[in-house]
A protein has these predicted regions:
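N-terminal nucleic-acid-engaging modules of covalent nucleotidyltransferase systems
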Residues: 1-125
Length: 125
């Protein structure tokens, strides 16, 4: 998951189309299956996790620091994932973060009731 996060970060700062293609090509070349396939699916918008939607993530932020402060922070930062990353303190004793494949496969199997606990556990890692 960390390598995919680095790819997304690099893509966001790369203005040139060919530069973006080189970044994606390098990632796909250096990444083993199934993460390579899941990354391609994510980049093309083919993944859907019915139980993990932005409203659920917003509710985590509101619980964490209060609704008003979260909305002010989100408005200032402008991106939900970035806002959560800035306000969510990782706990050092939670182990390594999951791989991209683990994230996708777990969220595909998770029920609506299981998803919040899974996502919070990952945010803590």
């Amino acid at each position: 998951m960390q390598a995919f996060a680095r790819l997304l970060d690099a893509l966001s700062y790369q203005p040139a189309r060919n530069g973006k293609l080189r970044l994606i090509e390098a990632y796909l070349r250096d990444t083993a299956d199934p993460d390579r396939g899941w990354a391609l699916a994510a980049l093309t918008g083919s993944l859907d996790f019915p139980a993990a939607k932005p409203a659920l993530l917003r509710s985590f932020g509101e619980e964490r620091i209060g609704a008003e402060l979260f909305h002010l922070s989100y408005d200032y930062v402008g991106d939900l994932a970035e806002t959560l990353a800035l306000i969510w303190e990782a706990r050092p004793d939670t182990g390594p973060p999951p791989s991209l494949g683990e994230v996708v496969e777990t969220l595909q199997r998770a029920t609506k009731m299981q998803t919040p606990a899974i996502l919070k556990r990952w945010l803590d890692s």
